[in-house]
Amino acid sequence: MTGGTERVAAAVDLLKQGKAEKLLISGVNEKVDWILLAETIDELPEELGDKITLGHVACNTRENALESKAWLDRNGFQSLRLVTASYHMPRSLSEFKDVMPDAVIIPHPVFPQTVKHNEWWKWPGTFALITSEYMKFLVVVLSHVLPFSTTSFNIETAGSK
């Protein structure tokens, strides 16, 4: 999932190491293309271009999961590595497991350098980030047990190049 060059770089590294056959970068701004992506990643081999899909449909974590499921189904995969920031992983995992309960989801957390992991409560920015993410996580958990849907998502275009 997008949200920082560290996440994308980690995902590309997994692809380079052969730990994934293909890569979907979900939630990419519509202005971002392969050329701009290559400029932001150090040592991005051109031959990886055919293995990377830029998903321009998703606008939130739930939609990232839906876009990823559509891409997984289209490619015939039953498992994925979920690469996102460590603080975002619990909510992401919850959404992904809800959308694709039969898929094997391997979490691969990234630890952004800008987020203070030790004594995070002493850093106002990190405190706000962690508490906000926790509140969103609680909302997601509740949404999975309550009988309503808040997503209007075009599954037809999800996860396509």
Show the residue positions of the predicted features.
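Hinge/cleft segment of the Venus flytrap/periplasmic-binding protein
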Residues: 151-161
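A transmembrane-helix-recognition feature enriched in membrane-embedded lipid enzymes
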Residues: 123-153
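A structural signal for short, hydrophobic/glycine-enriched beta-strand patches
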Residues: 1-124
